Amino acid sequence: MNLKTFCFFLLGIFVTLTVTVIPIANADAEADTFRGPCLKIKGYKC
């Protein structure tokens, strides 16, 4: 495997991880945003 191929390989992994992980992280953040007020109001997880 030459350097150029290796760089494209790494870039592909990075893009795949970014595309996969960021929506999951965003979904978790949104869930926490909704969960937060519920915890304060009701005192338990929704």
Swiss-Prot record:
Family affiliation: Belongs to the formicidae venom precursor-01 superfamily.
GO cellular component labels: extracellular region
Post-translational modification, as annotated: Contains 1 disulfide bond.
Keywords: Disulfide bond, Secreted, Signal, Toxin
Stretch forming the signal peptide: 1-20
Protein name: U-myrmeciitoxin(01)-Mg6a
Propeptide residues per the UniProt entry: 21-33
One Gene Ontology molecular-function label: toxin activity
Subcellular location: Secreted
Tissue-specificity statement: Expressed by the venom gland.
